[in-house]
């Protein structure tokens, strides 16, 4: 059975993740998970997110909408 403290930790981690998502943005012009290298740059280089051009994991453009120009 999951303890109350474990649930609390999970909630805090989820809140931190949501705050980070709001700050960086999944579709935030090259500043989401596919854009840690700077504006318009994903891990794979210019115009790339995790999964390639415009498609990250689950088919989402993690690199943002304004990258790869």
Curated annotation (Swiss-Prot):
Segments traversing the membrane: none
Primary localisation category: secreted
Residues modified as Tryptophan amide: 58, 67
Tissue specificity as recorded in UniProt: Expressed in hypoderm.
Residues annotated as signal peptide: 1-22
GO CC annotation: extracellular region
Glycosyltransferase listed as a keyword: no
Keywords (A to Z) from UniProt: Amidation, Cleavage on pair of basic residues, Neuropeptide, Repeat, Secreted, Signal
GO BP of this protein: neuropeptide signaling pathway
Induction: Upon D.coniospora infection.
Compartmental location: Secreted
Modified residue annotations for Tyrosine amide: 29, 39, 46, 53
Stated family: Belongs to the YARP (YGGW-amide related peptide) family.
Function in brief: May have antimicrobial activity. May play a role in response to fungal infection.
The name this protein goes by in its record: Neuropeptide-like protein 30
UniProt organism field: Caenorhabditis elegans
């Amino acid at each position: 059975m999951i303890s109350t403290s474990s649930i609390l930790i999970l909630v805090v981690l989820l809140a931190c993740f949501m705050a980070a998502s709001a700050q960086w943005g999944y579709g935030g012009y090259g500043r989401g998970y596919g854009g840690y290298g700077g504006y318009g740059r994903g891990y794979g280089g210019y115009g790339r997110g995790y999964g390639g051009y415009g498609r990250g994991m689950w088919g989402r453009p993690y690199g943002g909408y304004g990258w790869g120009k």
